[in-house]
């Protein structure tokens, strides 16, 4: 991928990677101080201290009751700390503008992802809401800005589960009835469920969505029949891989 991208700048990539590594080392020293001076500095910042020997990287977990499986970046075996890392940009941090809905700098998709991970731990281990220190780490930025404490927002967690259930139900319906029954729903207006009309959406997101969806509505009858048949087959295969299939049935 990098060899064929004319925009790729290896020097900048190397510099950015070194900065990320430096920031990560600082975060480790804050959460898991190795010396007395580091521990004092963390305490001065109001940071809780955690046992480095209990830290585990990228543990995988599954919760059948919630229908969630995932892999978090860092946690401790005593379930006192949960950290999800994001290496990309966060414009809230760069512009010093908090999210108006949450009064903090985290981005909602990342917040939702972390809440779902925490929901699994809470359900599987019967944890109280104040048992786990939940953190989002934007490692592109120094820890003072990028290491964020986030709260367990139960309303947002329930909304995420509800939205996931709606997606699953829609996927089952399309797989059963055929993709042609949903083709007309693939428009920017329908997909923009939040009704966003800000500059970023109209300048960047909407053109990308239109580039994908607009050709779907200009297909010839033969092209549409082939495309819908293929999409139905692919979706059914995906559903079978996730939930299994009854013996004796097929996806043809």
Question: What function would you assign to each model-found segment?
Answer:
Residues 1-79:
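Metal-dependent nuclease catalytic cores that hydrolyze phosphodiester bonds in DNA/RNA
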Residues 2-13, 140-152, 211-217:
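Charged, low-complexity surface segments at secondary-structure and domain boundaries
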Residues 8, 12-23, 148-158, 203, ...:
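Alpha-helix boundary/N-cap detector
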Residues 21, 32-33, 46, 96, ...:
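Short, flexible coil/linker elements and helix-boundary hinge sites characteristic
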Residues 31-38, 121-124, 167-174:
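Solvent-exposed amphipathic alpha-helical surface segments
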Residues 40-45, 81-82, 86-89, 245-252:
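Acidic/polar, low-complexity linker and loop regions
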Residues 50-164:
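Mg2+/Mn2+-dependent nuclease catalytic core
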Residues 155-252:
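Accessory, charged alpha-helical segments in nucleic-acid-processing enzymes
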């Amino acid at each position: 991928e990098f060899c064929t991208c004319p925009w790729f700048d290896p020097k900048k990539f190397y510099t950015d990677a070194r900065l990320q590594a430096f920031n990560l080392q600082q975060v480790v020293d804050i959460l898991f101080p190795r010396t007395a001076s580091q521990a004092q500095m963390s305490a001065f910042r109001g940071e809780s201290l955690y046992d480095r020997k209990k830290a585990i990287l990228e543990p995988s977990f599954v919760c059948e009751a919630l229908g969630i499986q995932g892999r978090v970046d860092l946690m401790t075996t005593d379930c006192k700390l949960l950290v999800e890392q994001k290496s990309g940009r966060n414009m809230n941090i760069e512009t010093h503008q908090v999210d108006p809905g949450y009064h903090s700098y985290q981005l909602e998709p990342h917040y939702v992802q972390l809440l779902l991970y925490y929901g699994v731990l809470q359900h599987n281990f019967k944890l109280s809401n104040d048992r786990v220190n939940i953190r989002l780490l934007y490692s592109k930025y120094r820890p003072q800005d990028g290491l964020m404490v986030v709260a367990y927002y139960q309303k947002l967690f329930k909304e995420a589960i509800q939205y996931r259930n709606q997606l699953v139900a829609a996927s089952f319906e399309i797989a059963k009835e055929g993709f042609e029954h949903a083709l007309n729903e693939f428009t920017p207006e329908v997909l923009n469920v939040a009704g966003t009309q800000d500059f970023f959406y109209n300048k960047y997101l909407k053109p990308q969505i239109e580039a994908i969806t607009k050709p779907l509505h200009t297909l010839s009858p033969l092209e549409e029949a082939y495309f819908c048949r293929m999409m139905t087959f692919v979706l059914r295969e995906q559903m079978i891989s996730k939930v299994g299939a009854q013996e004796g049935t097929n996806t043809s």
